[in-house]
């Protein structure tokens, strides 16, 4: 809503909207008037969205690029099932998990202050050679795994390998559930139903959005069955 209002005001005043300015205004309004710390890259996603492409963000440099969608003129699609969960219902848990992940990554960064997380020796973490507790190790491993999966998906998109795209999506969802322990009964139920549907090759819970979603890689012919 904030993005829409920001763009509408620019149009109403006859101004040419500068994307970075609109994003900053939306971010500040969310914080000042709603006490919400909204991710700026999500606002940029909405402002830069183009039909037929995905956005791949580089969180290290704050840059992004468009990646052509492999689903154009294909018999597969990414389907979204809306959980219709009241946003307030999960807000507290999402904040708690966000702070938990942030604290874990900061603990890891302090061990190798001179090395960027992008070049972090993940093998040392997996082999338990670093003095961190098990919870921190598990969370950090998932963050690195998620980053690598995003790069893998870019390659799979180029290859139009829908089955492997579905498997990668399921891997992310499984990590959220098992390693971050972020769950929601309603969304878990929708995700489980998708796996049981013939023609669905993978799914993951997506907590961004009004009521939570389940994203699925599915054959178009399987929509009705789901």
Question: Where are each of the predicted segments found?
Answer:
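C-terminal nucleotide
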Residues: 50-204, 216-226
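Gly/Ser-rich oxyanion-binding loop with an adjacent helix/lid
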Residues: 1-71, 196-197, 223-226
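Glycine/serine-rich anion-binding loops at beta->alpha junctions
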Residues: 1-5, 199-215
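Short alpha-helical patches at coil-to-helix transitions and adjacent helical residues
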Residues: 2-6, 38-41, 146, 150, ...
């Amino acid at each position: 809503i904030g993005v829409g209002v920001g763009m509408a005001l620019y149009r109403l005043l006859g101004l040419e909207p500068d994307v970075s300015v609109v994003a900053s205004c939306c971010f500040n309004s969310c914080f000042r008037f709603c006490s919400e710390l909204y991710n700026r890259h999500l606002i940029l996603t909405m402002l830069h969205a183009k039909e037929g492409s995905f956005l791949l963000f580089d969180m290290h440099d704050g840059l992004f690029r468009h990646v052509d969608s492999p689903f154009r003129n294909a018999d597969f699609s990414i389907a979204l099932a809306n959980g219709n969960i009241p946003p307030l219902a999960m807000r507290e848990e999402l904040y708690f998990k966000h702070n938990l992940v942030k604290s874990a990554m900061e603990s890891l960064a302090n061990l190798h202050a001179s090395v960027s997380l992008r070049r972090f020796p993940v093998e040392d973490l997996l082999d338990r050679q670093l003095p961190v507790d098990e919870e921190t190790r598990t969370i950090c491993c998932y963050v690195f795994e998620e980053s690598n999966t995003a790069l893998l998906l870019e390659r799979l998109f180029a290859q139009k390998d829908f089955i492997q795209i579905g498997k990668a999506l399921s891997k992310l969802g499984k990590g959220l559930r098992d390693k971050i322990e972020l769950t929601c009964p309603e969304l878990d139920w929708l995700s489980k139903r998708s796996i049981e549907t013939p023609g669905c090759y993978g799914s993951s819970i997506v907590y961004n959005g009004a009521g939570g979603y389940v994203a699925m890689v599915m054959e178009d012919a399987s929509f009705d069955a789901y």
